A protein has these predicted regions:
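Extended, hydrophobic/aromatic-rich amphipathic alpha-helical segments that build helical scaffolds
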Residues: 1-15, 19-34, 64, 146, ...
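Short, solvent-exposed loop/turn segments at the edges of secondary structure
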Residues: 1, 57-59, 252
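Elongated scaffold/linker segments in the mid-to-C-terminal portions of large proteins
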Residues: 39-203, 263-308
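C-terminal structured "cap/appendage" subdomains that terminate the fold
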Residues: 213-272
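Acidic/polar loop patches that form or flank catalytic/metal-binding clefts of enzymes
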Residues: 36-47, 225-228, 250
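Sparse recognition of residues in long alpha-helices and their boundaries
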Residues: 20, 48-49, 207, 255
Length: 308
């Protein structure tokens, strides 16, 4: 997995023209993962939320993860940021997705006027009694119900269509009257590797194979197969968006934006905050990385990158 990521970086990040030999190494490295794991790594085809077990060894999708347990470390690994407070959730919905037992300073997770447009395009159009019941009154927009972001019937925007992510639920400890967010933190997950492979295949012009991988993740999310254009730019943007939806809170999208040279399109303030013109294509050969304070302390000759 690490080798594949390294070669995808050398294949795409340093030039707008992909290095085919490096793409081939990345693809071969990804294809070798199931065998190298003794067959223990596989794509989960049903119940998306079941992928995210507290312990990585219980999930066939996890390739490499950092151990986490509230009993021996911090009580919260920040996944509470994608969890609803209980005071936002109707009683009839409280067993549907992970919630906090008490108001611990958590914010609503909304898909509406304040939410990233990547998620908003898959928001549930109508309010539903049961987001898991395909026979309810979903109407003509049912195929836009992304099961990764379940309708919660919390009508905060007046449109009846607020959603919540259902991954990394941690554990509800009733004796403590609270939820601990202590899922093991995935570094590499098999679906992420498949999407990385799709990126490599797209760079080689193999668009049908890219669509096949997109449809794997879309089908599991309850979405219709991809039916959009298959020119390079359109498909690349769709792939970047799918990584954002599927790999939320798994630290993958940023690196994909850099490899695609599309940070400016998606995070324009990244360059604007550094005094550069985000509309100038020439600046995208340069990316500024922060230098950790601990590193600067050890080497006082280092100068912090602009903007940090």
């Amino acid at each position: 997995a690490l080798k594949a990521e390294v070669y995808m970086w050398t294949a795409r990040a340093y030039s707008t023209s992909a290095v085919v030999a490096d793409l081939d190494v990345a693809i071969a490295s990804i294809d070798a993962i199931p065998g190298a794991s003794g067959g223990s790594v596989s794509f989960v085809t049903s119940d998306w939320k079941s992928i995210f077990k507290r312990q990585a060894n219980d999930c066939p999708e996890y390739i490499w993860a950092n151990y986490f347990d509230y009993l021996v470390g911090p009580k919260n690994n920040l996944h509470d940021a994608i969890t609803l407070r209980i005071d936002n959730v109707p009683i009839e919905m409280q067993g549907t997705f992970p919630i906090a037992v008490t108001d611990e300073g958590l914010n609503r997770i909304e898909i509406g006027s304040n939410m990233n447009t990547i998620f908003r395009k898959y928001e549930t159009i109508e309010a539903h009694d049961n987001p898991f019941d395909k026979t309810d009154d979903a109407g003509p927009f049912y195929d836009k119900r992304d099961l990764r972001y379940i309708n919660s019937m919390v009508d905060t925007n007046g449109d009846g269509s607020t959603n919540v992510c259902i991954k990394f639920p941690g554990i509800l400890v009733t004796t403590d009257n609270r939820r601990y967010w202590d899922n093991d933190l995935p570094i590499y997950r098999w679906t992420g590797m498949l999407l990385l492979k799709a990126e490599a295949l797209l760079a080689k012009g193999q668009t049908s194979a890219v669509v096949d991988i997109l449809n794997m993740t879309r089908t599991r999310a309850g979405l219709a197969n991809y039916s959009g254009a298959t020119d390079f730019n359109t498909l690349e943007n769709e792939l970047l968006d799918e990584v954002a939806r599927e790999m939320l809170a798994e630290n993958q999208r940023w690196w994909g934006l850099i490899r695609a040279h599309k940070v400016g399109q998606n995070v324009p303030r990244f360059m604007a905050n550094r005094g550069d013109d985000s509309t100038d294509a020439n600046i995208w050969n340069f990316y500024y990385w922060p230098i950790a304070e601990s590193v600067k302390i050890k080497n006082d000759k280092l100068v912090q990158s602009p903007g940090y």
